[in-house]
């Protein structure tokens, strides 16, 4: 490309111009904290080392319980809640930039809309693997909670559009017509 890439360290460094942003698998790269309530007590899921220096999951008491109850109402015992404060903070700052300069954003990610549960996973060579093994060799991720993202955007004054699956999004853009056009114009070798 004849256009140089400019790397920014923060949202505040964005120029004061209208924003058109596409975030593809951006939000799922942000850190997520997991919590579980057992017998009415909230605990945070952490990682620790055993005496042989093997990683394992453990649960430690959490003082975050008041916010968890507010965010998720009455949560059944032993259900996992995932909280991504960095995503909410990012959306808040990003919303302010859009409100000030106008613009829009499209975020594409593996996601859900407000469901509870453990979505933490590791992928290596297109296969799911143990997140605590082969450190640094796997893609670690959690599914994005788009309810939290849209709530944060709306709280900060933006309008959030309907959440769509990738399939429906592409169909709405006319992918079927495009595929049919391309197929009609294939030569014999390409078919």
What do the predicted segments below correspond to?
Residues 20-72, 118-131:
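A mobile, often basic/glycine-rich helix-loop segment
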Residues 67-191:
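Long, Lys/Arg- and hydrophobic-enriched amphipathic alpha-helices
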Residues 1-6:
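Conserved nucleotide-cofactor-binding alpha/beta core module
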Residues 8-39, 81-89, 93, 97-99, ...:
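A short SAM/SAH-binding and catalytic strip from SAM-dependent methyltransferases
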């Amino acid at each position: 490309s004849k256009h140089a890439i400019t790397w920014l360290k923060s949202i505040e460094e964005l120029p004061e111009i209208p924003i058109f942003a596409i975030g593809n698998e951006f939000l799922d790269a942000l850190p997520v904290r997991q919590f579980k309530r057992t017998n009415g007590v909230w605990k945070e899921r952490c990682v620790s080392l055993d005496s042989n220096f093997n990683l394992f999951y453990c649960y430690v008491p959490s003082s975050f319980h008041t916010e968890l109850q507010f965010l998720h109402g009455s949560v059944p015992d032993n259900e996992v809640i995932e909280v991504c404060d960095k995503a909410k903070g990012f959306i808040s700052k990003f919303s302010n930039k859009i409100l000030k300069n106008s613009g829009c954003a499209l975020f594409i990610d593996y996601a859900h809309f407000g469901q509870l549960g453990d979505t933490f996973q590791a992928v290596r060579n297109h296969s799911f693997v143990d997140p605590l093994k082969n450190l640094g060799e796997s893609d670690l991720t959690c599914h994005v909670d788009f309810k939290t993202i849209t709530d944060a955007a709306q709280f900060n004054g933006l309008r959030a559009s309907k959440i769509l699956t990738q399939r429906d999004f592409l169909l709405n853009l006319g992918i079927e017509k495009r595929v049919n056009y391309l197929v009609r114009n294939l030569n014999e070798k390409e078919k």
